[in-house]
């Protein structure tokens, strides 16, 4: 997931990016910081602005390909720089001011034609809430149920457990224990397990966990640990048989 926030200098891009990245546990790439460090060899010619955008886009794609959500705040003033950056999953235009502090950027600025959110005022909290709700992003501060397992492979019994988990909270995290190769019962690497789950459970939030074997907690820690009883038919599902059927 790549979320790009564009707009003139001083329009509130970084403020919103900081708030949003914190709520969805994303990597935050600030274009000013990247320009001052990694891209310090670039100036402000049209060609260098396009190259700056291209490099930022490649950085965001690299991080996203590793399973990380990325929020990029970046002026991205022209159609050429936006094309060089690439199409994000979500584009947010902060249209809160008519002029920024840099005259050359004001002259370069071209009104965006493609965006998912268009904000004309400052309200990072309300805007973050709106983006998370409408784009169905996972809010790391919302009450969440944890569903922990190996899922070698994901099957009907796991789906039933997921439905029970959603009865507890509106948001569920499916945590996949990284047990690949630890036994003959664990032939699937994490990414294949995750892909299979996402194919079956379209809105699922799947994360990689260590090979958790024990859970220890203190008194009255603010959460519940419970075993969910499923029907005898679902409990009788054999993961070993499922693996045989799938040729694993």
Give names to the regions the model predicted.
Residues 94-138:
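Small-molecule kinase domains that catalyze NTP-dependent phosphoryl transfer to phosphate-bearing small molecules
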Residues 2-4, 146:
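Short hydrophobic/aromatic beta-strand immediately N-terminal to the Walker A/P-loop
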Residues 11:
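ATP-binding Walker
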Residues 136-248:
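Nucleotidyltransferase catalytic core that binds NTPs
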Residues 45-99:
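Glycine-rich phosphate-binding loop used to anchor ATP phosphates in small-molecule kinases
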